Amino acid sequence: MQKLESRGVILFNRNYRENDKLVKIFTKQAGKRMFFVRGGGSGKLSAVIQPLNIAEFMMTVNDEGLSFIEDYSQAESFKEITSDIFKLSYATYLAALTDAAIADGVVDAELFAFLEKTLVLMEEGLDYEILTNIFEIQVLDRFGVRLNFHECVFCHRVGLPFDFSYKFSGLLCPNHYEEDERRSHLDPNVPYLLDRFQGLSFEELRSISVKDEMKRKLRQFIDELYDNYVGIHLKSKKFIDNLNSWGHIMSKEDNAD
């Protein structure tokens, strides 16, 4: 047991017993922890423990069992995100993906900063779909998946119209397409963008602009990567997929009018 003060982001909360809450917080100093909040629905902590809120938490952290929030300060919420069902759905997925990417108790200040900054940029109005793609690609290594989208796996040449090979877990240049007859047949812009996404800085994020058709191609291929290399199936991701389908149907109906 230790007393600790740390910045943290609420990943989720759920009811526990009749009036209490269990709250998963990703903290900068102590990693992900599950906290017990007595009277969570009506106590002084009720506002701050809502998903995606960020604050400085004064905590009692236990290595085994539940931890406890003693107090908090500097609470921040993302009003633009929580008022938009699409942004909220994508942000919720990022929180769930973060929860899946590292074990509880593992300190990962870099991932914490990346999640926080991604949420801030989403709140500021940057493209939430592309921000999500970038997050998905950069968090792959937390699942033990390290893919090189920069060069051909055979000749290491760069800057060519590459395709992806699951057989070799990497890119093929035109001279080596024949090495895998079941290569992905991607639009070459997909691996080009994924290469950029892997090393993109936060400031560069502001200049990224991707057309809808390319977004669909990115979404399809990243889904395939996660199916083949990660194998997780998050409810929040399924909700996004359904939401996008509904959105496309609504868009078609609006155009028909």
Curated annotation (Swiss-Prot):
The keyword Phosphoprotein does not apply. Disulfide bonds: none annotated. Pfam families: RecO_C, RecO_N. Gene3D superfamilies: Nucleic acid-binding proteins, Recombination protein O, C-terminal domain. GO terms for cellular component: bacterial nucleoid. Keywords: DNA damage, DNA recombination, DNA repair. The keyword Cytoplasm does not apply. Involved in DNA repair and RecF pathway recombination. Belongs to the RecO family. This is DNA repair protein RecO. It comes from Streptococcus thermophilus (strain ATCC BAA-491 / LMD-9). The lineage of its organism: Bacteria, Bacillati, Bacillota, Bacilli, Lactobacillales. The gene is recO.
